[in-house]
Amino acid sequence: MAKSTSSAPSQRMLRVGEQVRAAITQVLQRGEVLDPLIENTVISISEVRMSPDLKIATAYVTPLGVADHAAVIEALNKHAKFIRGRLGPQLRQMKYMPDVRFRDDTSFDNYQKIDSLLRSPEVSRDLDRDADDEE
């Protein structure tokens, strides 16, 4: 059977990514990471992307209510090995425990930019003009 050459994640990568996301969320909710910056910040994990070999998990996080996202991301990456160790009980079925890497999730900012562009007067004028042409 030939391997797929597409860059889309496989069902297995998506399933494992969701399991890792849930496990990291539980570790953070229970307050197991003893770092004041992490303990005092609400952290939203929007997605975890797995490498094809399932050995690297990249977690996209958004620290809420904090101006300095980079400091929170740095603190999470500093404690990544500890967090990886705490994932073990919830991910027993995995042959290898993935290395966890944290990245800032910029997708919400991108959505806001697109929304503001769509609401701009120039774009709404063009959309109105297109609607008039169709009639």
UniProtKB/Swiss-Prot annotation:
One of its GO terms (cellular component) is cytosol. InterPro entries: KH_dom-like_a/b (IPR015946), RbfA (IPR000238), RbfA_dom_sf (IPR023799), Ribosome-bd_factorA_CS (IPR020053). GO terms for molecular function: ribosomal small subunit binding. Gene3D superfamilies: 3.30.300.20. GO terms for biological process: maturation of SSU-rRNA. Pfam families: RBFA (PF02033). Keywords: Cytoplasm, Ribosome biogenesis. Transmembrane segments: none annotated. It is found in: Cytoplasm. PANTHER family: RIBOSOME-BINDING FACTOR A, CHLOROPLASTIC-RELATED. One of several proteins that assist in the late maturation steps of the functional core of the 30S ribosomal subunit. Associates with free 30S ribosomal subunits (but not with 30S subunits that are part of 70S ribosomes or polysomes). Required for efficient processing of 16S rRNA. May interact with the 5'-terminal helix region of 16S rRNA. HAMAP family: RbfA (MF_00003). NCBIfam families: PRK00521.2-5 (NF001802), rbfA (TIGR00082). Monomer. Binds 30S ribosomal subunits, but not 50S ribosomal subunits or 70S ribosomes. Belongs to the RbfA family. This is Ribosome-binding factor A. It comes from Rhizobium meliloti (strain 1021) (Ensifer meliloti). The lineage of its organism: Bacteria, Pseudomonadati, Pseudomonadota, Alphaproteobacteria, Hyphomicrobiales.
